[in-house]
Curated annotation (Swiss-Prot):
One of its GO terms (molecular function) is ATP binding. Catalyzes the specific phosphorylation of the 3-hydroxyl group of shikimic acid using ATP as a cosubstrate. Its main location: cytoplasm. It comes from the Bacteria. Disulfide bonds: none annotated. It catalyses: shikimate + ATP = 3-phosphoshikimate + ADP + H(+). It is an enzyme of class 2 (transferase). Mg(2+) binds at residue 15. Binds 1 Mg(2+) ion per subunit. It comes from Clostridium botulinum (strain Langeland / NCTC 10281 / Type F). This is Shikimate kinase. InterPro entries: P-loop_NTPase (IPR027417), Shikimate/glucono_kinase (IPR031322), Shikimate_kinase/TSH1 (IPR000623).
């Protein structure tokens, strides 16, 4: 499948880079969190509160399965999507996976800078929780086809496009 799948921690810039990549490549943008909100007609915060995290993770798996037969998409995943149910391996089947690796210190700055009320797992700006999440997820994220370790927006875009073209054999 010829999709780009962006993975990484919450606050790593997946949605922002995804929007720009979709414009550059003329691909449709799919934000998995937004898609789930539309499917459920509820915010993620409400879904977690009413149905729980397991239900939300089932919806993520439904989305992965939906895109197994589609191409020309930039898919921006929720931070936990690759982690659960060994989804990282399923994501690699639907496209070129890109881990946006942002240093923990930068993620903490981003979290503290803005209140992330819509992200149920980041409520209360708990830096210890974010640090623990980072440690628990990094090994799985690093199974992506490529890792982008750049906090510079423009350079990240260029690097992703180059790596994707190389992966496609262009």
């Amino acid at each position: 499948m010829e999709n780009i799948v962006l993975i990484g921690m919450p606050l790593s810039g997946k949605s922002t880079l995804g929007r720009e990549l979709s414009k550059i490549l003329k691909y449709d943008l799919i934000d998995t969190d937004t898609l789930i909100e539309e499917m459920e007609d509820k915010s993620i915060k409400e879904i977690f509160k009413i149905y729980g995290e397991d239900y939300f993770r089932e919806k993520e798996l439904e989305i992965i399965n939906k895109f197994k037969k589609e191409s020309n998409k930039v898919i921006s995943t929720g931070g936990g999507l690759p982690i659960y149910n060994k989804n990282i391996y399923e994501l690699k089947k639907i496209g070129f996976t890109v881990y946006l690796k942002v240093p923990l210190e930068e993620l903490i700055k981003r979290m503290v800078k803005k209140e992330y009320d819509t992200r149920p797992l980041l409520k209360n700006n708990d830096t210890k929780f974010l640090e623990e999440m980072y440690k628990n997820r990094i090994e799985i994220y690093e199974k992506a086809h490529t890792i982008i370790c750049n906090t510079n927006y423009e350079e990240s875009l260029i690097t992703i496009v180059r790596a994707y073209k190389k992966w496609k054999g262009i």
